[in-house]
């Protein structure tokens, strides 16, 4: 059995934008160490549910994530 080689982690900056319908109202930035940009995006979106901007009283709450190298 050979040891598994894990992918090196890279640091990504992920901007999560919060919308009410099509109107943007806030952005939070996360620095995420991850193996891929997709993994960083998913982690940031998951973390954003704990944001003060994630509020059930906001109509048609949506969010998007933009990933860039740190």
Task: Go through each PLM region and give its residues.
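Amphipathic alpha-helical segments in structured regions that serve as interaction surfaces
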Residues: 12-14, 44, 65
């Amino acid at each position: 059995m050979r040891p598994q080689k894990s992918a090196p982690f890279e640091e990504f900056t992920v901007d999560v934008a919060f919308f009410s319908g099509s109107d943007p109202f806030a952005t939070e930035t996360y620095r995420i160490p991850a193996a891929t940009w997709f993994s960083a995006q998913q982690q940031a979106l998951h973390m954003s549910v704990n944001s003060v901007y994630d509020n059930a009283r906001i109509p048609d709450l949506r969010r998007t994530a933009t990933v860039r190298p740190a």
